[in-house]
């Protein structure tokens, strides 16, 4: 097994899943969706969605269409944390990975809203896995995964 080749395949699959679930800018909220997408597409290793896919494969598998919404969601949650961490009230970073941070590109208020939007949209995205549930067991597994995902960005996880 060629580790580099396999890892690149996982990263490409993660990139595709993330891109597939990005919010589509609509007239009323186009500026927020644009800032959200800018943030998510700013680069990165995509380690979290790759690890999620690998774990799903190792521990019994899961249909691709059921795991992909969670892969995108976990990357959105990670990105939300970076967007908020870069804000002037936190680290005041103006560049990340050689690009302007979200608040530096769009302004502080839009940076806050983009981060908030990513966190909320992550749950909406993960819930799309229910569309692919084949039976009650799938529904239970998705509900448990969603509960676990929702518990980690808050006070019992990233904030605690």
PLM-predicted stretches and their roles:
Residues 1-22:
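N-terminal amphipathic/basic leader segments beginning at the initiator methionine
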Residues 22, 26-160:
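Mg2+-dependent prenyl diphosphate-binding active-site environment of isoprenoid biosynthetic enzymes
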């Amino acid at each position: 097994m060629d580790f580099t080749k396999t890892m690149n395949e996982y990263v490409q699959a993660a990139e595709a899943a993330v891109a597939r679930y990005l919010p589509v800018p609509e007239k009323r909220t186009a500026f927020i969706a644009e800032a959200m997408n800018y943030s998510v597409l700013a680069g990165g290793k995509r380690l979290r969605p790759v690890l999620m896919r690998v774990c799903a494969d190792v521990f019994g598998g899961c249909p691709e269409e059921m795991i992909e919404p969670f892969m995108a969601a976990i990357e959105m949650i990670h990105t939300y944390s970076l967007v908020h961490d870069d804000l002037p009230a936190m680290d005041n970073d103006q560049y990340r990975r050689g690009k302007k941070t979200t608040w530096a590109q769009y302004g502080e208020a839009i940076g806050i809203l983009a981060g908030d939007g990513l966190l909320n949209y992550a749950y909406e995205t993960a819930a799309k896995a229910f569309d692919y549930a084949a039976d009650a067991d799938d529904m239970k597994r998705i509900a448990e995964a969603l509960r676990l995902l929702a518990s980690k960005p808050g006070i019992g996880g990233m904030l605690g």
